[in-house]
Regions:
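Conserved flavin/dinucleotide-binding core of flavoenzymes
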Residues: 270-376
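Mobile amphipathic helical/loop "lid" adjacent to a hydrophobic cofactor/ligand pocket
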Residues: 12-131
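Mid-domain catalytic core of redox enzymes
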Residues: 177-299, 305-310, 337-338
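A short coil-to-beta-strand element that immediately follows conserved catalytic motifs
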Residues: 29-31, 174-175, 242, 311-323
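Local beta-strand N-terminus motif with an aromatic residue
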Residues: 5, 27, 196-197, 315
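Helical element adjacent to the flavin cofactor pocket in flavoenzyme catalytic cores
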Residues: 133-189, 197-198
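Short glycine-/acidic-enriched loop or helix-start segments at secondary-structure transitions
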Residues: 18, 210-212, 217, 330, ...
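Conserved N-terminal glycine-rich FAD pyrophosphate-binding loop of Rossmann-like flavoproteins
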Residues: 1-9
Length: 376
């Protein structure tokens, strides 16, 4: 069972391109639906399958449960964002950016969007990054706002196919082989005793920081200082957790593959997914809790109560998966580590400096840029 129930959107152009490149058909592996932020009571937004940005305008105009004043406040504020080309003071939080929006708009649109895109609550999430995500989703490619929900697990969505693609072309994949250090040898690098032209660090932030801290003493003075500073910047990142509570109920089925939930301190899940509509067994639901530091037992009990209160379902807990360092905290003015460390040494990952938060698309674009950087 995956953790986090990954959501892709149509604006993930590089992810979709790379999937096709390695032989994965997005039409078969992803369920495509219009942008939907509907609650169990039927209120919320649902974009029609219209051209960009008419889909967003229509979704706002027809939002269920919203007063005319709610819709008007969002249109006024969003027009201002567009007028300013979706740019703002980098020190602003999403909550500060949206302070003129009405409470319902914040609760039923901004907060769910923010926590799903940045995995950071609006009170401490970067407004600048949030606006970049909105710009690409709502005003980028046609269909950029459409939800793409995986029908297969994450390994089959890309990594397994990518490994097969590489092997078919003569690439070597060495599993279970931990790298202790990366040694500089003039214009080359040594990894596990093997001399190579270049190294791309495609690891977690903590592992990359450890590796470069151990490698710095053997590098040339200028490179050593860069590696130490990079490791320091990376180790200073803070992280947010993601938890997924899997629960089952006989005959349990949602009106849509994904529903938004009203979240608070005692009802922590922000989204629920109907796994039966995404290739899973009947009756299995997945509740996703982003940016929470509660223990698994507490989360599980709270989510089961939330299911009774908001969905009217009495469910049996199957498994609770918690990843404490799932994504970096995407806060205002955050300093992220650079991609280029030294000639022939490049880092990539969703945490590396870039315009996006910790998303699949951010990671894929970072990897693509790293490969392109080797040829510069």
């Amino acid at each position: 069972l995956d953790n986090g129930q990954h959501i892709l959107i149509g604006a993930y152009t590089e992810t979709l391109r790379l999937m096709r490149c390695v032989g994965v058909d997005p039409e078969k592996t992803l369920l495509k639906t219009p942008m939907t932020l509907l609650f169990p009571d039927g209120n919320g937004l649902r974009f029609p399958a219209w051209p960009t940005p008419l889909d967003a305008l229509a979704g706002i105009a027809t939002a269920r449960g919203w007063a005319l004043a709610d819709k008007g406040s969002l249109l006024r504020v969003a027009t201002g964002w567009q007028w300013r080309r979706f740019q703002c003071d980098p020190t602003l939080s999403v909550a500060q950016l949206c302070q003129n929006l009405r409470p319902r708009v914040m609760a039923e649109l901004i907060e769910p969007l923010c926590v799903s895109a940045l995995n950071t609550p609006a009170q401490r999430a970067s407004a600048a990054v949030f606006l970049r995500v909105l710009k690409d989703a709502l005003f980028g490619v046609q269909g950029g706002s459409r939800l793409l929900l995986p029908r297969v697990d994450l390994s089959e969505l890309f990594p397994a196919a990518a490994a097969r693609w590489l092997a078919e072309r003569g690439g070597q994949i060495r599993l279970g082989s931990r790298v202790a250090s990366v040694l500089q040898q003039g214009a080359r690098w040594q990894v596990q005793g093997e001399s190579v032209d270049a190294v791309i660090l495609a690891t977690s932030a903590s592992e990359a920081s450890r590796l470069l801290s151990q490698s710095a003493p053997t590098a040339a003075d200028a490179t050593a200082a860069t590696l130490r500073q990079w490791a320091h910047t990376t180790s200073a990142l803070t992280f947010e957790a993601i938890a997924t509570v899997y629960a089952w109920g006989a005959g349990a089925r949602l009106a849509h593959p994904m529903l938004t939930l009203r979240s608070n301190a005692t009802q922590p899940a922000q989204f629920v997914f109907d796994r039966s509509q995404l290739g899973g067994p009947p009756g299995l639901l997945a509740f996703v809790v982003s940016a929470s530091n509660a223990d698994p037992q507490t989360l599980q009990a709270q989510v089961l109560q939330q299911a009774r209160a908001q969905l009217g379902l009495t469910l049996q807990a199957i498994q609770t998966v918690v990843e404490k360092r799932a994504t970096f905290a995407c806060t205002p003015g955050l300093r992220r580590p650079a991609q280029h460390l030294a000639p022939g040494l490049i880092a990539c990952g969703d945490y590396v400096d870039g315009p996006y938060p910790a998303t699949l698309e951010g990671a894929v674009r970072s990897g693509t840029a790293a490969v392109q950087g080797l040829s510069l």
